[in-house]
Every structure is written in C-alpha cells, then in structure tokens.
Amino acid sequence: MTKKRHLFTSESVTEGHPDKICDQISDSILDAILSKDANARVACETTVTTGLVLVAGEITTSTYVDIPKIVRETIQGIGYTRAKYGFDAETCAVLTSIDEQSADIAMGVDQALEAREGQMTDAEIEAIGAGDQGLMFGFACNETQELMPLPISLAHKLARRLTEVRKNDTLSYLRPDGKTQVTVEYDENGKPVRVDTIVISTQHHPDVTWEEIDRDLKEHVIKAVVPAELIDGETKFFINPTGRFVIGGPQGDAGLTGRKIIVDTYGGYARHGGGAFSGKDATKVDRSAAYAARYVAKNIVAAGLAEKAEVQLAYAIGVAQPVSISVDTFGTGKVSEDVLVELVRNNFDLRPAGIIKMLDLRRPIYKQTAAYGHFGRTDVDLSWERTDKAAALKEQAGL
C-alpha cells in the first residue's frame, strides 16, 4: 500500500501558562532540596488559581527549604509581577501541605526485591527498587539535528521565542501566558517537507491592536524561528485567533503540575506511559526511566541503527530490574529489534540506581526542564541528550 502525504501537529506553551507555572514551582522546590540533600525523596505537586498557590505532596529530607519564598521567586522570574496581570508574586497567597513519603513505599525503594532475595549482581549499584509500577517511553528520530520530531521542535522554539521577545522588551506589550502549535506536512516517505499551519496565542496588554500583534509575531517570532524554506504561499497563520487575550495565566485558568505531559515529551508523535515528570526525584521511574528511554532511543538513532526508535521500559514497585524492555523502529531498523533489545541490555543499566548513576540524576538540574520540553534541548546540557553510547552500539551491531 502506497503511503500518502499527511499532516502532523504538536503544541507547546510558554513558561507563563498556568500548568507550566506549577511544573516550574514543583521543580524549583525539588532543586532547592536536592542542592542540600541529594538523597531526598520528593513528590511535590502544585496548583495555582487567581491569587492562590497550593503546594502539596510527600517530601522526606534532612534539610529545610523556604517553600513560600521559592514559590514567589519562581513566579517573579516568569514575569507575574503586577496585580493587574491577575497574579502577582508578592501578593498571592501560598499554602503548603507536605507529608513524608509513605513508609510502605520507602521500604520497597530503600531495598529492592532482588537485594532482599540476594539476587543483586552488581555490587556497585546500591539497592534501589522502582518507586512505582508503570511504563515509560523514549523516542528519537532523524528529522532534526537534536533527533526530535519537527512539529514539537518548532512549537518549543516558537514558545521560547515568545518569552524572549517579551522579556527583552522587543514586544513589551506581551504578557506571560501563551501557546504555540505547528502542523507539518510529511511526504510519501514520511519526511517533513513544509509547515502547513502555525497557531500562536499570546496574552497581551489591553491597549494593543490585533493587527499590531499579528504583524509583530510574524516578524519577530515566526521569521526568527521557522526556517524560510519550510514556509510557502500555502502556509496558514492563526495569530490570537479569538482576537483578544488579555485575561490569562492563573486568572484565566487554574493550573496543575503534570498536566502538560505531551508538551514535555514528543508532542504526541510517540506513545506516552502517562506519568508526569515535574516535582519528582530520580527514584520515581516516571521521570528517571523516561529520561533513560530517551537516552537509549537517541543513541540508537545517533548510531545509525534506525531512522526512528521508540523504547518502552516497564517496572514493578520495589523491583529494580525492568520487567520489560522493547524497541520499535517502525521498519527503519538496520538490525532486528531483538538484536537492539540485547544491545540495550548490554550497554545500559536500566535499574533505578543504575539510571541515577548513569545519568547523574541526584543534581539540582530540573527547573530548567520544566518549560520548553525535557528532550531535544540544545540550550542546556542534559545527560540524557548525550550520544556517548552511539559508537559502541554501532560497533557491537557490526555496522
């Protein structure tokens, strides 16, 4: 059956989006704790609404951090600094409700099942079981230099640029909340050939006209980010299509940690196990194993073993070894998927403690991931984005 040309769409949001405010607060608290206590257990959830922030969750640590102070500093950094924006770092109420991690969970994480049964084979790796059951996916493809799908890559770049021109006063009438969406057309071979549609919605000062916003965003945001060769006379632009976006941020919509999991990953291009990232320390496989799966997939593609690769990992609570590892190359693999799974097992330690050690995840590195995506980042140095295993994989595959 002949493949047809098709469209695929992904979206991103700015750091001022209500859900992203929550992700950044949760990860700022996590970073503050990890900077003083690398072995802390953190599961920190945030919700925001008009004039109110609630931080709740389970945190077990030997240190103290000033949560309200961290909350206010994070909100200020995003740009909610005036009451007329509907949300103000100085005047919003901050409520906290923090418990310790459940002793039942801690028991399984502190000493993994294999250690309790004397089956741990690697003495170097401390016995840490998975903090929960679950399945995680990692993905990579050769559509972009950073080995990410083009739609989410462009959507993130537009969202980041929207924030940039607001903060550097190029477009001083912009306010923090905003969303971007990019539709890419793929040819019969599944290769991206053009941008079909761009949607940008941005919060703004009440006195600016739609015509001004439309002109400025095309000039200072879209042209600055999207390669000219991807845009043609048929490309459609929808800039603030409702005509007005003054009420935004937590005043416009309540926000919650972990509600932008597709924005955080691959824009819907790959499957998702359902677990969110922000506010969780690395013993939570929702986060660490998703990072590891991306690391594996990216190295497979970087090694030339496939044009695209999706890796699934799955865990049982309290058990260190993954219960399953699978690799799907969508027919683009240079070797069989069975061979790839064997290569993955031989080159990557995918036990929770192995992942933490391999990717050095006990550091305060998480706030920078809480907006504009956790993968394909070129602006920050993230260990799971390295391709340092590619040469070994290629050699062992005999290519």
UniProtKB/Swiss-Prot annotation:
It comes from Bacillus anthracis. Catalyzes the formation of S-adenosylmethionine (AdoMet) from methionine and ATP. The overall synthetic reaction is composed of two sequential steps, AdoMet formation and the subsequent tripolyphosphate hydrolysis which occurs prior to release of AdoMet from the enzyme. Residues 101-111 are annotated as: Flexible loop. Mg(2+) binds at residue 19. ATP binds at residues 17, 177-179, 244-245, 253, 259-260, 276, 280. It is an enzyme of class 2 (transferase). Binds 2 divalent ions per subunit. Binds 1 potassium ion per subunit. Belongs to the AdoMet synthase family. Pathway: Amino-acid biosynthesis; S-adenosyl-L-methionine biosynthesis; S-adenosyl-L-methionine from L-methionine: step 1/1. It catalyses: L-methionine + ATP + H2O = S-adenosyl-L-methionine + phosphate + diphosphate. It is found in: Cytoplasm. Its cofactor is Mg(2+); K(+). The keyword ATP-binding applies. PANTHER family: S-ADENOSYLMETHIONINE SYNTHETASE (PTHR11964). Its EC number is 2.5.1.6. InterPro entries: ADOMET_SYNTHASE_CS, S-AdoMet_synt_C, S-AdoMet_synt_central, S-AdoMet_synt_N, S-AdoMet_synthetase, S-AdoMet_synthetase_sfam. One of its GO terms (molecular function) is magnesium ion binding. This is S-adenosylmethionine synthase.
